[in-house]
Amino acid sequence: MNKELKLFGDVLYISNAEYIYNDLHSIQKDDGLSDVIDLLDEDLLQIKYLNGSIVDVGWYPSFDESGYFKVMSIRRDDWENPIYSSTLGFNLNQLLEEIKIAISKI
């Protein structure tokens, strides 16, 4: 069964997800960094799959306007060696694309 993931006005359908934690749901594509900086922390999105794999998104350092998004795909709880990892500044269109790539790696 697919689970629905709402991001920046778009909807992605995630198959084989055990659960989805989505703290990005209230951010819209036209929001600026200063509009949402109080929402940006290390725990923004986590998709846990039935096979134990994880897609994880956070903002580092939390609540810091000079920070960056980090997107990772993790297998077998090996956080030290992600199968995919990307960092990027505040660009929500690019973030959506990076999340799609991370999902495709699982």
Residue ranges and their predicted role:
Residues 80-106:
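Polybasic, proline/glycine-rich intrinsically disordered low-complexity segments
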